[in-house]
Curated annotation (Swiss-Prot):
Annotated Polar residues bias: 97-110
Region span, Disordered: 87-110
Pfam families: YcgL
Lineage of the species this protein comes from: Bacteria, Pseudomonadati, Pseudomonadota, Gammaproteobacteria, Enterobacterales
Lineage: superkingdom: Bacteria
Record-given protein name: Protein YcgL
Domain YcgL positions: 14-98
Record-linked InterPro entries: YcgL-like_sf, YcgL_dom
Gene: ycgL
Organism: Salmonella typhimurium (strain LT2 / SGSC1412 / ATCC 700720)
Length: 110
């Protein structure tokens, strides 16, 4: 009897490698391959500083990421080779409080 070999078809899993900025707090750079910043603009790398490895993360099968939109990350990695996650805007607690008590926060209206 003749043996038949059937090749396994493996889909390419999507991974990303996440680096923390050494210059900017809560700023992260996602790339496709570890230590490969070849598709990241030089000016961005200069402002980002020395990348510090934070984690490697499989994107397939995930429903969401903590501080980034999964589909935006996947699209950016595919199209430009990187995704830059910036920190959330600072909370303006005074503005929130004044708004909750019905006061206008515009300096012109004071």
């Amino acid at each position: 009897m003749r043996q038949v070999t059937i090749p396994l078809i493996q889909s390419k899993s999507m991974f990303c490698v996440i680096y923390r900025s050494s210059k900017r707090d809560q700023t992260y750079l996602y790339v496709e391959k570890k230590d490969d910043f070849s598709r990241v603009p030089e000016a961005l790398m200069k402002g980002f500083g020395q990348p510090q490895l934070a984690m490697m993360l499989p994107l397939d099968g995930r429903k969401k990421l903590v501080n980034a939109e999964l589909e935006k990350v996947k699209q950016a990695l595919s199209e430009q080779g990187y995704y830059l996650q910036l920190p959330p805007p600072p909370e303006d607690l005074l503005k929130q409080h004044l708004s909750s008590v019905g006061q206008n926060t515009s300096p012109a209206d004071r």
